A protein has these predicted regions:
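N-terminal nicking endonuclease/strand-transfer module with a His-rich metal-binding environment
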Residues: 1-191
Length: 191
């Protein structure tokens, strides 16, 4: 059975800060950076401090109890790791396009939904991307994450096919890519 050019893994865990610290320990010689995020303001920062990013991502969790009267349960951090095993390298615009597709189809950040979940896409290795999100939306409700792993795999398959990563020629015609902007550095703390 052939391997897919974009390998993806979806999991839910308890701690956003711990996950971000774990992901920061990436490939030696590669400087991790924030590719994009739910907030254009955050994505425009030159340097992102990991504890600050974790606090911002988790803010809807902290506001959930006062809004809804319910305490949030465990495993509220959503993590999607995507690795490119194809011989074709993906640039930031490609990763940006794939990120937008993944957060849209999974229900993490549907296009045009102002109360969607908070998420961030981090480039931690030259051939991969990690998307981190909280599953509580801005309005305090749970995100509708039904079959999210399947949706991510489907988005990766479609992207790989459309860009010729699966051995087939890329689909030609009108192509629109959103600007991802320059690489932005990530640091563990402000000190």
């Amino acid at each position: 059975m052939p391997t897919h050019p974009l390998c993806c893994d979806v999991r839910r865990i308890e701690g956003t800060a711990d996950l971000l610290a774990e992901l920061h320990c990436g490939e030696p010689g590669f400087a991790p950076y924030l590719l994009t995020a739910w907030s254009p303001v955050l994505a425009a920062w030159d340097t992102v401090i990991l504890p600050d990013l974790a606090r911002l991502l988790d803010e809807p969790l902290a506001l959930r109890k006062p809004r809804t009267g319910h305490t949030a349960s465990r495993r509220l951090t959503w993590h999607c790791a995507i690795r490119n095993t194809a011989s074709v390298e993906l640039n930031d615009n490609d990763w940006f396009e794939l990120t937008r597709e993944v957060v849209d189809v999974t229900g993490i950040g549907p296009d045009g939904d102002p109360a969607a979940c908070r998420w961030a896409a981090l480039s931690n290795t030259a051939d991969g991307l990690d998307i981190v999100a909280t599953v509580i939306r801005e309005d305090g409700r749970w995100a509708r994450l039904h079959n999210d792993a399947y949706c991510v795999c489907s988005a990766c398959w479609g992207f790989a096919h459309d860009h010729g990563l699966d051995g087939s020629p890329p689909i030609t015609g009108f192509y629109h890519s959103s600007p991802a902007g320059p690489n932005r550095g990530i640091s563990r703390s402000s000190s």
